[in-house]
């Protein structure tokens, strides 16, 4: 069976780059295709503190660079293109991108997830003009300004801490009366003198003329609304899996791809790893584990095709 590669990995986050390392170690011809920047969600981590083996925390960016260097050193090729379709004919996968086409005997989908949108007035209108989903990327534009963070989970807390080093006016808006983040991150957030939390509050609208100037808030207990002046709004209210390339694969009730313990999807020859798959806990370490398992399973699958 003649193909360009043994395995093509879609996505160069922690799961994809881990899969690339293990695929290459299994002597598979490996291509990683990434439409944006390698690193995925890890790039948003200001300080990676809970990854085994790193006694001294490193930034998500540094971690991503290390992962890429390892994958390339093992022999992986990385193409920065956007995959448009994945098809299968006679046990061969055909992957098309905006600039070319490739064939492979197996595919590992490591496309991850993207930030959930609220769909409220002003959110899309002010994107890039005060509305953002990445504090690490856009925070420096609002140095010494008043910024609002929407959410109460790990991402919201972590990004609020990032912003607190750029400004002393960070206001978190959370619809509940306690943070949902891991205890250590939540405690660090609440102790930060530059971060204030408005509890039991929802965001109703983002307002402004040419850029963000305020937000409309609602007290979930009383129904009372009020306006809060600010310069930027950062949204961290959860993630949505990126599964459009695999519409026929089995998914759970929230849209994540269902796999078995070896990362096999319901489509033979396609494996899923990282935040795109259904699981109870999503961290960098679980993504890298998924990637290793997916590569191992892909190698076993290819063996069955060749023997």
UniProtKB/Swiss-Prot annotation:
Coiled-coil zones: none
Swiss-Prot/TrEMBL cofactor(s): FAD
A Pfam family per the record: Pyr_redox_2
Lineage: superkingdom: Bacteria
Enzyme Commission code(s) on record: 1.8.1.9
InterPro entries for this protein: FAD/NAD-bd_sf, FAD/NAD-binding_dom, Ferredoxin-NADP_redctase_2, Pyr_nucl-diS_OxRdtase_2_AS, Thioredox_Rdtase
Keyword rRNA processing appears in the UniProt entry: no
Positions of FAD binding: 34-41, 275-284
Any one GO molecular function term: thioredoxin-disulfide reductase (NADPH) activity
NCBIfam families hit by this protein: TRX_reduct
Designated name of the protein: Thioredoxin reductase
Organismal lineage: Bacteria, Pseudomonadati, Spirochaetota, Spirochaetia, Spirochaetales
Gene designation: trxB
């Amino acid at each position: 069976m003649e193909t360009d590669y043994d395995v093509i990995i879609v996505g160069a986050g922690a799961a994809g780059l881990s899969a690339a390392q293990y695929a290459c170690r299994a002597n598979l011809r490996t291509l990683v295709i990434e439409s944006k920047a390698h690193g995925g969600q890890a790039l948003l981590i200001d300080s990676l503190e809970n990854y085994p083996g790193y006694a001294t925390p490193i930034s998500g960016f540094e971690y991503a660079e290390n992962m890429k260097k390892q994958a390339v050193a093992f022999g992986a090729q990385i193409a920065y293109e956007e995959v448009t379709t994945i098809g299968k004919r006679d046990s061969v996968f055909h992957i098309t991108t905006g600039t070319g086409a490739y064939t492979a005997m197996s595919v590992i989908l490591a496309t991850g997830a993207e930030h959930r949108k609220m769909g409220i007035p002003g959110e899309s209108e002010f994107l890039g003009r005060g509305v953002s989903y990445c504090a690490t990327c856009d925070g420096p534009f609002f140095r010494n300004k008043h910024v609002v963070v929407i959410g109460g989970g790990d991402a919201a807390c972590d990004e609020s801490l990032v912003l607190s080093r750029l400004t002393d006016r960070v206001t978190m808006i959370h619809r509940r009366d306690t943070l949902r983040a891991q205890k250590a991150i939540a405690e660090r957030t609440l102790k930060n003198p530059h971060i204030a939390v408005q509890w039991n509050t929802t965001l109703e609208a983002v307002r402004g003329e040419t850029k963000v100037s305020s937000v409309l808030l609602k007290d979930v207990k009383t129904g009372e609304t009020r306006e809060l002046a600010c310069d930027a709004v950062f949204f961290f209210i959860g993630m949505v899996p990126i599964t459009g390339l695999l519409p026929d694969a089995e998914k759970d009730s929230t849209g994540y791809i269902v796999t078995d313990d070896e990362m096999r999807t319901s489509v033979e020859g396609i494996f899923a790893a990282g935040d795109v798959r259904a699981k109870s806990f999503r961290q960098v370490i679980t993504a890298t584990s998924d990637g290793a398992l997916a590569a191992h399973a892909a190698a076993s699958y290819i063996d069955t095709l060749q023997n």
